[in-house]
Amino acid sequence: MTLPATPVEFREHTFREHTIATDLAGGYQVVACDVNHDGKMDLIALASGMTDLVWFENPGWERHVIARNLPRMINLAAWDIDGDGIPEIALAHEFSMRAKESIGIVSILKHNGDPRGPWTVTEIDRLPTSHRLRWVDIDGTGKKVLVNAPLTGADAEAPDYRDRVPLVFYRPGDWKRRIIDDSSEGLVHGITITDWDGDGHDEILSAGFNGIQLYKVGAGGNWNRSLIAKGDPAAWPKSGSSDVAVGHIGRERFLAAIEPWHGNQVAVYRANGGVWQREVIDASLVDGHTIATVDLAGDGADEIVAGFRGKPQRVYIYSFDGKRWNRQTLDDGGISAAACAVADLNGDGRPDIACIGSATHNLKWYENLGPVKRTQR
């Protein structure tokens, strides 16, 4: 089922909008984490058009510079490696869409006693088009490794990007590059981390020209790759998937994806009879670039949050009513959402939403005020 181009809005949740910043040129990623170990979720903002990496301190959203002189930043991941309560930050920078011009530096940033002051930047690797970083508990011990998913292979060229793209990881300490897989071809845009089979070990889902793929480490440290879904069935390079998230409706797991690369579709996958069935629930996005799942109402059913960068620049929320997915507009034209993060930002027990805009240069958070009362609909 595909929603019409302008589906009827169904207001399910209420929000209060807050603007934090309006000068983040090329806003690309927002990460929610407790940067200063005070129990409140702060926001780290990465803007590819800036050379400063900044964070905003909850609750007043005071701005702090983590590090300067970091050109062409593209992605970060935060995790407390040493157990001092303050996360280290893995950062990919010196990025270019042209693989032969992309240095692909990966650095680890660590505070120097006060997270509000300058952090130390230590380079650990150079891998062309390093594009997505995530901390992953592959061993099931709570000690995470850093996964690096480059966008393309080193010799890839637009528009087909026909080259093998590596997927690698690093263990804190030696930071040696280790191969997960280097046989997949094309472009990989997004990865997400999940304990796919409930064994206490994290797995990796990737979204790219080859669709949605699952990477799982097996005995002896060998990695296995399996295809979950092919994504958009169009011909290469319009095929596959761009970003993927995992959600649940009760006990049932589903996947939500932006498709194809930077695409116009929100697709939902449900494993009916063990086979993942694709349903396009919206085909009206323009340059779709972010997708997340979150239980906004606390009812055990996850909503989907999706945003797109092209005009008319909107962020949508999709809620499942038992028969179909209904759409609500969270932001109409106020942010060209390159990324959204979900976290409880005001400590009221409800998850909120934060988004960063590329062309709009802004950072907003949307305070979750709870579901709309039935009498208001």
Predicted features and spans:
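Beta-propeller-forming repeat regions
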Residues: M1-R377
